[in-house]
Amino acid sequence: MQSFLQEVAADLYRRYGEDVSSLHILFPTRRARHFFIDALSHLAERPMWQPRWLTIDDLMQEVSGLHSGERIRLIAELYKVYSACHDEPFDKFYFWGEMLLNDFDTIDKYRIDADVLFRNIYELKELESDVSYLTPEQLEVIRQFWANFTDGATLSEEKRRFLAVWRTLGDVYHGFRARLQRQGIAYGGMMQRAAAERLLAGDFAFAERRRYVVAGFNALSACEKVLFRFLQHNAETDFYWDYDDYYLKNTDQ
């Protein structure tokens, strides 16, 4: 039985032959590329030029104009913003910073309104009545984010600290992003959001004609959906979705 990437390689080689080298092939991760190269090498009758390989982060970086920052540097930059509001040594902040960075990443990838999200936790009912413009996907991200901090009877020390600084998180989020923007670096979600906003504003175009293959994606973030719609309409693009047959054939799912 052929793997998904073997099937993609076989179909592309059948359609393009050695012209497959003219394609830009976009994978979710770099690891998928190695399996695809192995599958393609078994199909080719002689040595051939490889396609151009990209990950989603590579293309988001090109569109956004930002560069991916190393995680330790990102946390250090976050601490500089956070420490302006709260007196806490870096060694105690580090775990907290990891969690905040992950949360900021999710907020941006799903294009969540951070100002709505960071309202006072005790005004949850107000938030619930002010979500008519949000998609079900965005609502679910918000609910998952808030679920960790709403059970006052079982709060851990980390959660208590979160509640104590809740009112400042909006300022920390915006200040952190502005600081990174000035340095031309970003975390993954910030880079994706910047790319999506640039595409939606019509402020980006490829300098040359390109043919893309998007392979191996399934559940997409809001920013990825914007990018793929752009590729669909502004480049010759083939999509190979990696969905489980169970969900495709079972209409109740």
Question: What function would you assign to each model-found segment?
Answer:
Residues 1-12:
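N- or domain-start disorder-to-order transition segments that initiate the globular core
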Residues 19-32, 212:
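Conserved RecA-like ASCE P-loop NTPase motor core of nucleic-acid helicases/translocases
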Residues 20-23, 47-51, 208-210, 234-237:
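Short glycine-/polar-rich loops that comprise or flank the Walker A/P-loop
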Residues 25, 214, 239-241:
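Structural beta-sheet core signal
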Residues 30-206, 222, 244, 249:
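Basic/charged alpha-beta structural segments of nucleotide/phosphate-handling enzymes
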Residues 208-220:
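Conserved P-loop NTPase "ATPase switch" module shared by AAA+ and STAND
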Residues 210, 222-253:
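Conserved RecA-like helicase ATPase core segment
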